Amino acid sequence: MELQGKTVFVTGSTRGIGLEIAKAFAKEGANIVLNGRREISEELIASIEAFGVKCVGVSGDISDFKNAGAMIKETEEKLGAINVLVNNAGITNDKLLLRMTEEDFDQVLKINLTGTFNMTQQVLKKMLKQREGVIINLSSVSGLMGNAGQANYAASKAGVVGFTKSVAREVAPRGITCNAIAPGFIQTDMTDVLSDKVKEQVTQSIPLQRFGSVEDVARAAIFLAKSPYITGQVLNVDGGLVMHG
């Protein structure tokens, strides 16, 4: 898909990976919908408009199905039909399994997996009529290989992989692609809190011997959006941490 003038909705895009993905699409000439649970600041909107594109902020809770629908409707009223949906929003709540409450588990799945379902189903209603569209879901290497203390997060991200492949099969006849990106250890405020010792241990496990950048993930999103013959795939952006035979 050529991105000039298209409308791209990126959930959880007020900072980190989501914001960088939004900027990358703006650089390609796409109009951007910034999203978060709180009201989007005018300064943030202006930073995207500086690329010469339109940008609106749409706040709301993706884990609420009706709220997800309302956000899609608001976007369509302001910018027209959505051409690309990037399901980036996600949370963590790391604890060892025996210390994890039912609420700890459910909360992470509700945002990471149910939220992805909510936004995808709501946006597909019009995409199917358009017979064109791109859906990109953010998974994680944790969903591919597991990680101690992340049973809830890994389960949610593994669910995103299965969801992505199933949706891809359903919508392919209408010319819509659905893929996932599985980032590894990416330098963000979430990894900044790790101790130097932990960072060194992690780095030693990565073949490329370094953390990735938010730009690495954003480039993967642009690649998938521009690749109409790739669907149902999981693109690892992890420095070689997970290698499939």
Regions found by a protein language model. Give the residues of each.
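Active-site helix of classical SDR
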Residues: T120, S156, T164
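Residue(s) in the substrate-gating loop at a strand-loop-helix junction
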Residues: S140
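Conserved glycine-rich Rossmann-like NAD(P)H-binding loop of the short-chain dehydrogenase/reductase
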Residues: E28-E43
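Alpha-helical segment proximal to the catalytic Tyr-Lys
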Residues: K125, R169-P173
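Substrate-binding pocket helix/loop in short-chain dehydrogenase/reductase
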Residues: L96-L97, D104-L109, V202
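C-terminal substrate-recognition "lid" of short-chain dehydrogenase/reductases
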Residues: L124, E132, R210-V237, V242
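Conserved glycine-rich cofactor-binding loop
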Residues: T7, T14-R15
